[in-house]
Amino acid sequence: VVSHFNQCPDSHTQFCFHGTCRFLVQEDKPACVCHSGYVGARCEHADLLA
């Protein structure tokens, strides 16, 4: 089974402000899985509707 995500390298441990960093294998770039109540590419915004 091939995963689309890997753990982010150490160089990206602080990439996500309020979330977990995952590395997109096919796009070769980091992405964030935001904690509840946060949105944005790097989970940098509070979700005022949450």
UniProtKB/Swiss-Prot annotation:
Q: Which domain of life is it from?
A: Eukaryota
**Recorded GO CC terms:** extracellular space
Task: Please state every residue range assigned to the domain named EGF-like.
Answer: 4-44
Task: Assign the protein's first listed, main location to one coarse class.
Answer: secreted
What is the tissue specificity? Gastric parietal cells.
Record has Disulfide bond as a keyword: yes
Entry keywords, A to Z: Disulfide bond, EGF-like domain, Growth factor, Mitogen, Secreted
User: Subcellular localization, per the record?
Assistant: Secreted, Extracellular space
**Got any disulfides in this one, which pairs?**
8-21, 16-32, 34-43
What Gene3D superfamilies does the annotation carry? Laminin
Q: Which GO molecular function, any one, fits this protein according to its record?
A: growth factor activity
Biological processes per GO annotation: epidermal growth factor receptor signaling pathway; positive regulation of cell division; positive regulation of cell population proliferation; positive regulation of mitotic nuclear division
Subunit composition?
Answer: Interacts with the PDZ domains of MAGI3, SDCBP and SNTA1. The interaction with SDCBP, is required for the targeting to the cell surface. In the endoplasmic reticulum, in its immature form (i.e. with a prosegment and lacking full N-glycosylation), interacts with CNIH. In the Golgi apparatus, may form a complex with CNIH and GORASP2.
Q: Tell me, what does this protein do in biology?
A: TGF alpha is a mitogenic polypeptide that is able to bind to the EGF receptor/EGFR and to act synergistically with TGF beta to promote anchorage-independent cell proliferation in soft agar. Inhibitor of acid secretion. Inhibitor of aminopyrine uptake in parietal cells (in vitro).
Give the protein name, as stated in the record: Transforming growth factor alpha
Species assigned in the record: Oryctolagus cuniculus
Which gene does this sequence derive from?
A: TGFA
